[in-house]
Amino acid sequence: MTHKLDPVLDAGLRPEASFMKSQNGEKWGYIDSFKHEQGQSKCVFETDEDGSFLQLTLMNEDVGEENVPELLEVINIMNGIQDQVRFFYHLGNGSLFAKREFLVEGRKPKQIQEMVFERYDRMKDIFDDVLWAFDWKVRTGGDFEALFEALAKHNEDRKKRKDRNKGKEGFDPAYA
């Protein structure tokens, strides 16, 4: 059984990517695993039967339950300085989540692909920033001003790596 948004996944991720129907039949989903600077994470792509929306949920299950106050500080800062994704921490399993929803009803697959996957790459960078900032905060105990300075330097370095690695065959600069 295929979903009408399967071509979007195929073009944006890999040819074998396709949505699977949930057990209760209300939603369709696909899980993409990706590697980034701070480790391995996943993204759940969810939609409904009609393909009226596409929700992306990034998750990292390795955050753990130690240093929760520092993590919540970083999450609050990042939720406050950008509005592209919302971050959540699940106390029950020690996982970090980031969500963003796109209304895609009435759009052509190519439009959806361009809209979603450009933002997906940016979401992964922002997600990596939160994990990096959390690690930095735990290691240094620094204040907010020092955190912003360190994060700006981290992002400059990321941009340099992406620019340097563009054009290397088989290399995706989003994972630099």
Give short role names for the model-derived ranges.
Residues 131-176:
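Short, highly charged C-terminal tails/helix-capping segments
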Residues 1-42:
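Charge-rich, low-complexity N-terminal segments
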Residues 41-67:
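Short, conserved beta-strand/beta-arch hydrophobic-aromatic motifs that form part
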Residues 57-99:
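Short, internal acidic amphipathic alpha-helical interface segments
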Residues 90-117, 121, 132-139:
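Well-ordered alpha/beta subsegment
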Residues 37, 62, 104-105:
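Short, surface-exposed beta-strand-loop junctions and turns on beta-sheet-rich folds
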Residues 26-30, 52-54, 94-96:
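Hydrophobic residues embedded in beta-strands of well-ordered beta-sheets
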